[in-house]
Regions:
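Short, charged, surface-exposed secondary-structure boundary motifs
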Residues: 108-116, 244, 266-267
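Divalent metal-dependent hydrolysis catalytic cores, especially in the metallo-beta-lactamase
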Residues: 51-53, 59, 65-87, 150-153
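Eukaryote-biased recognition of electropositive, low-complexity segments
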Residues: 234-236, 240-274
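Short acidic, glycine/proline-enriched helix-loop-strand junctions
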Residues: 88-103, 204
Length: 274
């Protein structure tokens, strides 16, 4: 085995150990499994310039195909995070299905001219319209989400759009201060990127968060309501209905059986657990 192969193997093992370590903290009877990042054909306005020029969607996968894959991979609750819209979620809710409303919004850090993706959950159709406007300024976007108790996750934190070239490390400090939740396992990214992201998030001690705030020249709690709490999530980022649900997040819901017996919806339990 050459050095490159050995390196990739060790990265894979480290990522698996990180996942197993986190999973072991949740009692087996109090787990909800959800893929927090997947797409169907309602992701029809791609971010990529070529896709916009050609007028093609990011995927032609139907909702039924996506749901079948999610079920086959053992998810307990469904969300569909299409780009900048939650049409699939609203359609499923209209059919009487229990769904956690979600979308992947393309947002901009205006002071750096850097584009990022923010997974957002628990909003209403009216709030979706407002989020679509605010996404051009991620600071206003996050403020609105905090004000209305909407859950946000920074998707694939090491992948962003920077037309002016590689941005300064201050961008990473700003992102670390902006968000509480980070997608550290993305099914479309190589193990090295996921491990590097997990290491970055795990390194956000209280001391490091204060150092980040000094470098960013802002108070630690300017945006985050709980600046010292950092959570890690996972999602398949599936666009082909091939891997949806094979990567995801295990949520901890204490007294899950009692909540289900009392008639609580899985979507509400998932939202509260996030």
């Amino acid at each position: 085995m050459n050095n490159a192969s050995l390196f990739r193997q060790r990265l894979g093992e480290e990522l698996e150990n990180t996942i197993l370590r986190s999973q072991s903290l949740i009692p087996e009877g109090e787990r909800l499994r959800i893929d927090l990042h997947c797409h169907d054909r309602n992701s029809d306005k791609p971010d990529e310039r070529l896709g916009r020029m050609l007028g093609v969607p990011e995927t032609w996968v139907t909702t039924d195909e996506l749901l079948a894959t999610l079920r086959s991979n053992g998810t307990d609750i469904v969300t569909v995070t299409n780009h900048n819209n939650a049409r699939t979620c609203w359609e499923l809710l209209e059919k009487g299905q229990d769904v956690l409303p979600g979308a992947e919004f393309s947002c901009t850090l205006p002071d750096f001219e850097v584009g990022i993706h923010v997974l957002t959950y628990g909003f209403t159709p009216a709030q979706e319209e407002r989020l679509a406007v605010l996404r051009k300024d991620v600071y206003r976007f996050v403020d609105y989400c905090n004000e209305h108790d909407l859950v946000t996750v920074l998707a694939h934190p090491l992948q962003f759009h920077s037309p002016k070239g590689i941005p300064s490390m201050e961008v990473m400090d700003r992102l670390g201060l902006l968000f509480e939740r980070f997608e550290v396992v993305n099914g479309q990214r190589d193990a090295w990127q996921n491990v590097l992201t997990a290491t970055w998030v795990e390194g956000m001690s209280e001391e490091e968060i204060h150092a980040m705030a000094r470098r960013a020249r802002q108070p630690v709690d300017l945006f985050a309501r709980r600046p010292y709490i950092k959570r890690m999530t996972g999602g398949s980022d599936d666009h082909m209905a091939m891997y949806a649900g094979s990567t995801g997040t295990i949520l901890h819901v204490p007294d899950l059986a009692a909540h289900r017996k009392a008639g609580a919806s899985l979507s509400s339990l998932a939202l509260n657990a996030l």
